[in-house]
Amino acid sequence: MEGEKLNLDNIISRLLEVRGSKPGKNVQLTESEIKGLCQKSREIFLSQPILLELEAPLKICGDVHGQYYDLLRLFEYGGFPPESNYLFLGDYVDRGKQSLETICLLLAYKIKYPENFFLLRGNHECASINRIYGFYDECKRRYNIKLWKTFTDCFNCLPVAAIIDEKIFCCHGGLSPDLQSMEQIRRIMRPTDVPDQGLLCDLLWSDPDKDVTGWGENDRGVSFTFGPEVVAKFLHKHDLDLICRAHQVVEDGYEFFAKRQLVTLFSAPNYCGEFDNAGSMMTVDETLMCSFQILKPADKKKYPYGAGGVGSNRPVTPPRNAPAAQPKKGAKK
């Protein structure tokens, strides 16, 4: 939007207009509006640290994956910004039918409320992944490939971790064997792609595994798994109380690990129309007490929005501790 002013309030109200409509109705912003959202939010991401230091109270959400009407349900439940402060843990795009609406609303809120609304990078905010799992195809179908590249430039500037009141460590994936000091995260220079290995890769890709002692191989073929004592040591070393991460489907929308020292959050109910999982949002109050708000899976007859979505025939993020729930064999991403 060179020279043009971004009409943020108008963009937000158009994106919210479909509340109450039958899920699946698109909001077609102009290409220059979307470009403006990417460019302005990118400037804000770069003006703020790559390791955010945030204060409670706030609400934390896990993967959304283009399930736009569920994102609206989350806000209806938690309060539309600026009623509540939010931290999202990444994976805004791919899989669901409406990645564009989802990411555009999140970027618009980031620009409107830069000190109260925060977005971390997930492993799907990466060109090599969202080229394959639906976002590229959605951009190409509804706009053009150039716009997808504009999003890539924006995603390459997202922060990758946050610490809430010096006690809760948040990232999309998990811990890294390379992570000894928080300074290492602060030293990551942006813009950056997500490498195939190393600290940044692990923060976005690793998973906890109760059956592993120390570090293990990850079934995803990327990064590592880590056991309960890795969590305990990390928290003790950095004087933290909790790790909060996303990245895996969990049946109830949230799941504790390592004696409640780590929690996984997942905020896309009925993920891809192939799971009966709930979605959840974690509220952290001023005293750092955590509570969970649950989005039950919607009635499939009433809301058939997941079935047949972009990428519904592609392999799905594997659920934790629920091999029976896996809908299809295939690569695990």
Curated annotation (Swiss-Prot):
One of its GO terms (biological process) is chromatin organization. GO terms for cellular component: chromosome; cytoplasm; nuclear membrane; nucleus. Mn(2+) 2 binds at D63, D91, N123, H172, H247. InterPro entries: Calcineurin-like_PHP_ApaH (IPR004843), Metallo-depent_PP-like (IPR029052), PP1_catalytic_subunit (IPR050341), Ser/Thr-sp_prot-phosphatase (IPR006186), STPPase_N (IPR031675). The keyword Cell cycle applies. The active site is at H124. Residues 322-333 have a biased composition (Low complexity). It is found in: Cytoplasm; Nucleus. SMART domains: PP2Ac (SM00156). Its cofactor is Mn(2+). GO terms for molecular function: metal ion binding; protein serine/threonine phosphatase activity. Its EC number is 3.1.3.16. It is an enzyme of class 3 (hydrolase). Belongs to the PPP phosphatase family. PP-1 subfamily. Serine/threonine-protein phosphatase essential for chromosomal dynamics during meiosis and mitosis. Antagonizes the function of air-2 in the regulation of chromosome cohesion. Dephosphorylates histone H3 at 'Ser-10'. Also involved in the activation of chloride channel clh-3 during cell swelling and meiotic maturation. Essential for embryogenesis. Interacts with lab-1; the interaction is direct. Interacts with knl-1; the interaction is direct. This is Serine/threonine-protein phosphatase PP1-beta. It comes from Caenorhabditis briggsae. The gene is gsp-2.
